[in-house]
UniProtKB/Swiss-Prot annotation:
Keywords noted in UniProt: Cell membrane, Disulfide bond, G-protein coupled receptor, Glycoprotein, Membrane, Olfaction, Receptor, Sensory transduction, Transducer, Transmembrane, Transmembrane helix
Source organism superkingdom: Eukaryota
Disulfide-linked positions: 97-189
Protein name in the entry: Olfactory receptor 8K5
Chain's gene name: OR8K5
Upper taxonomic lineage: Eukaryota, Metazoa, Chordata, Craniata, Vertebrata
Length: 307
């Protein structure tokens, strides 16, 4: 029995999103549409904000990188989910699982701090409009994004290497529909308390630090809006922040719901719903919420097709 438990794994089995056969085809169609909208929407945002000189501003610089992260996050997860709807056995190879974990962590952690950088950008735009381009210089924008990518890559590689250099034993069934660190830890033969502690510490740090930046930025924005004498100015300020605030609430809410509940109350179905939201639904909604209703983006879109 012990020899069997220490057998080197070559593949994992992922849990299904649903075990009801009649829902397989409808869900495949839904997730295919979600993924196609995600790819088209985010690629459009990347191309428009790169090609149109009117969109070469700090705000659209952040939106371009958010679109890149959303596209990457969705592409890491969704194609495998779609494949699992049409195969009898939902397997993923050992190295593919490691790669999926690394890229997923890199993209999801990057999104935390891109959203917080966008909150700071909105704070500067509303509270210091005359100094906006001085404070949010091109150099600062590149430094902020560079630090985010370096930090997220470091953390993704650290957890992936730590987990996949240890031995897995027992069942090869991952209690999730993609490779994440939380469901992989109980499958390790050796004591995973160190990795589990690091996972909790980094998760809490990522959540709290990025959320505090968002919270403080919006508190200062709210104070500035309350001091505005013009109703038109207040309306414009609220419309500027409304889209970002909506996505922040949904994104952080789904993550908090999944990771901050006690282990004893974790249910696979509720975790699946939260995961679907921040890995598949939010990447689809972000380009729509942030930008496709924006007149500057619409003008850039029409200009691109006219040329």
């Amino acid at each position: 029995m012990g020899q069997h438990n220490l057998t080197v794994l070559t593949e994992f089995i992922l849990m299904e999103l649903t075990r009801r056969p009649e829902l397989q085809i409808p869900l495949f169609g839904v997730f295919l549409v979600i993924y196609l909208i995600t790819v088209v929407g985010n690629l459009t945002m990347i191309i428009l904000t790169k090609l149109d000189s009117h969109l070469h501003t700090p705000m659209y610089f952040s939106i371009r990188h958010l679109a890149f992260v959303d596209l990457g996050n969705s592409t890491v997860i969704c194609p495998k989910v779609l494949a699992n709807f049409v195969v009898d056995r939902n397997t993923i190879s050992y190295y593919a699982c490691a790669a999926q974990l690394a890229f997923f962590l890199m993209f999801i952690i990057s999104e935390f701090f891109i959203l917080s950088a966008m909150a700071y950008d909105r704070y500067v735009a509303i509270c210091n409009p005359l100094l906006y381009y001085v404070i949010m210089s091109q150099r600062l924008c590149h430094v902020l994004v560079g630090i985010q990518y370096l930090y997220s890559t470091f953390q993704a590689l650290m957890f992936t290497i730590k987990i996949f250099t240890l031995t897995f034993c027992g069942s090869n069934v991952i209690s999730h529909f993609y490779c994440d660190d939380v469901p992989l830890l109980p499958m390790l033969c050796s004591n995973a308390q160190e990795i589990e502690l690091l996972s909790i510490l980094f998760s809490v740090f990522n959540l709290i630090s990025s959320f505090l930046i968002v919270l403080v930025s919006y508190m200062l924005i709210l104070l500035a809006i309350c001091q505005m004498h013009s109703a038109e100015g207040r309306k414009k300020a609220f419309s500027t922040c409304g889209s970002h605030l909506t996505v922040v609430v949904v994104f952080y809410g789904s993550l908090l719901f999944m990771y901050m509940q006690p282990n004893s109350t974790h249910f696979f179905d509720t975790d699946k719903m939260a995961s679907v939201f921040y890995t598949l639904v939010i990447p689809m909604l972000n380009p729509l919420i942030y930008s496709l209703r924006n007149e500057e983006v619409k003008n850039a879109f029409y200009k691109l097709f006219e040329n």
